Amino acid sequence: MKILVINGPNINFLGIREKAIYGKEDYPYLLSLLEGKAKKEGIEIVTFQSNGEGEIIDRIQEAYSDQTDAIIINPGAYTHYSYAIRDALASIEIPKIEVHISNVHKREEFRHVSVTAPVCTGQIVGLGLQGYLLAIDAIISMNIG
């Protein structure tokens, strides 16, 4: 099984930006969590991070032809307004889970709406970095790979 984990804008700044919201652990720590989970479960996890909308869309489209079985995506702020990322996700007929480290529903009003979630299989919010691991567990339980 191959899972693509896409992280959008500013996720590379984990541990630097707004620690009270996103925690003190940094992006390399998140990558190590994902790597450990992949080894434990005997699956392949491919990670991708970009601050650019077009690069994220390109990577989603690449998943169509590179044997990706599922996508976990944290679109960052693009969650709330990127219909282009939404359309790219909708075009790939594999499980997709949207993850947010913070509980976006307890934050500013503009964060309460996700334009990308309706084209995803599910959404996990507010559980910190653990949300990524829960998304992996959910995908594994779907028996797709």
UniProtKB/Swiss-Prot annotation:
GO terms for MF: 3-dehydroquinate dehydratase activity
Originating organism: Lachnoclostridium phytofermentans (strain ATCC 700394 / DSM 18823 / ISDg)
Name of the featured protein: 3-dehydroquinate dehydratase
Top-rank EC class of the record's enzyme: lyase
Catalytic residues, chain numbering: Y22, H100
Site (Transition state stabilizer): R17
One Pfam match: DHquinase_II
Pathway annotation from the record: Metabolic intermediate biosynthesis; chorismate biosynthesis; chorismate from D-erythrose 4-phosphate and phosphoenolpyruvate: step 3/7
Gene symbol of the encoding locus: aroQ
